[in-house]
C-alpha cells in the first residue's frame, strides 16, 4: 500500500550544526541581513504580529536594537495606522511633517494636544504654512490663564533658531549649544516650515547606533493585514501612515485568496516591500514569489501556542520547511523568514543555517516589559498573558480571517491556537543581547563571518533522541537559572 509519503522531515531538535575551522571571533561576526531587497536589518530578528507581542512599545525597542516589529491587526484601521505613525515619529533625523498649531489656538486646546500627542513643542504657522513662532513647555509652564492664545506666549519669529534644508549635523548641534535650545526649525528660503530637529533624536541616535532606520533617519516598522475582503482600506491607511513593510498574513499562504491579495497589493504599490505567508513547501514559496512577495514567511504550526498541526493534521517540521523554501527561492534573491518554534538562540542559528535570512519570534518576546498586557502574579511569580492568533480570544477580536473563518459566529469558531501565560522576562534589549550573543558564538564555532555565510556554508548532522538528551542539561538540578536557558 502506497501512503504517498513525500519525504522525511526534520525540526530544530533533530539536527545540530557542525563546528568548523574558524578565524571568526564572536564579537567580530556581522549580524546584518536582508529582510527584503530594499530593507536591511542589523540583527536577524522580527517580532510576530500578535496581539500579546507587538504594539508601539515593542516595535520601537526592537527597531532601536536593529530588528523590525510587525504591528498586529486585531484593532481598528485607524488605531493600527496610529501605532505605525507613533513608531515612525518616535525618532526622526528630521521630523519632516511636524505637528503645527495656529496662532489663535488657546492654551487649553494646546494642553489637550500635548496630552494626546505626548510632546509639548509645536511650530506655530499661519494659514500659508509660513513660520511665525514656536511654542514649547517652557513658554506655557507657569501660565495660569488658559484662555490666552498661542500667539500671546509663543517664542516670536525674530527669536527663532532656524536652519536651511540640508544643514550638517555639526552645524545644527552648534546652533543648539549656542542658543541653549532643544529644537531647531528647518525652513526654506521663503521661511516656510519644512521640518523640525530635536536634540532628543540626536541623543537617541547616539545611544542606539545599531537601530534599523529608513533613509530619513526614522525607525522602521511593519504591520500585518489579512487577505480577506475589506483589507484594501487597511492597506491604504498603513501605507499613508508610512509603514516600511507590509505583512500579508495567513495561516495558509499557498491559498488563492492570499495570492490574489498579494497580486492586487503589488499592482497598486509596485515599490512597497511585501512579506507574505505562511507556507511550508517549495511550491508555496514559489507561488508567493510569483504573486509579487518581496519575502516569504515559512511556518505552518511550529509556534508554542499553535495547535494547527494537531487540529488539522497538517504541517511540515520547521527545518525542512525552511530548507525547501530557501532552496526554491535561492535564484530569485527573495529572502525566507523562519516563523515559529524558536526556543533558544541555537534555534535561531539552525533556522538561518537551513536557509532563512531572519527569524520571527513570538513567545521569546512575549512576557517582556514592552509587550502588551499587564503583569499578573501567580503563585509568587510574575507572568504576562500570551495567546495564539488562532486562539478563541484572538479570533473573536478580529484575527479569524487569518484562519479563513471570518464569517463564523463566535460560538462556531474552530480554534488553531491556545491562550496561556508566560513568565515575565524584563526588558527586550536583555533578551536580544542573549539571543544575539548565542548566534555570534555559533558563527565563531562554525567559522561564518556573516549571516550569508551561515546560510550557505554551515553543515548539519542529524541526531537521535539520545543526542538531544545529551545536548540539554542532564543529571543535575539547576539551582540558578541562566538568562538564555529556561526549560519548560
UniProtKB/Swiss-Prot annotation:
Residues bound to NAD(+): 249-251, 299-301
Binding-site residues for IMP, renumbered to this chain: 304, 339-341, 362-363, 386-390, 416
Enzyme Commission designation: 1.1.1.205
GO molecular function: IMP dehydrogenase activity; metal ion binding; nucleotide binding
Means of activity regulation: Mycophenolic acid (MPA) is a non-competitive inhibitor that prevents formation of the closed enzyme conformation by binding to the same site as the amobile flap. In contrast, mizoribine monophosphate (MZP) is a competitive inhibitor that induces the closed conformation. MPA is a potent inhibitor of mammalian IMPDHs but a poor inhibitor of the bacterial enzymes. MZP is a more potent inhibitor of bacterial IMPDH.
Biological process, per Gene Ontology: GMP biosynthetic process; GTP biosynthetic process
Binding site for K(+): 301, 303, 306, 470-472
Pathway given in the UniProt record: Purine metabolism; XMP biosynthesis via de novo pathway; XMP from IMP: step 1/1
Residue span, CBS domain: 94-150, 154-215
One Pfam assignment: IMPDH
Origin superkingdom: Bacteria
Keywords: CBS domain, GMP biosynthesis, Metal-binding, NAD, Oxidoreductase, Potassium, Purine biosynthesis, Repeat
Cofactor needs: K(+)
PROSITE patterns: CBS, IMP_DH_GMP_RED
NCBIfam families, sorted: IMP_dehydrog
Family of this protein: Belongs to the IMPDH/GMPR family.
Job of this protein: Catalyzes the conversion of inosine 5'-phosphate (IMP) to xanthosine 5'-phosphate (XMP), the first committed and rate-limiting step in the de novo synthesis of guanine nucleotides, and therefore plays an important role in the regulation of cell growth.
Descriptive protein name: Inosine-5'-monophosphate dehydrogenase
Organism: Haemophilus influenzae (strain ATCC 51907 / DSM 11121 / KW20 / Rd)
Gene: guaB
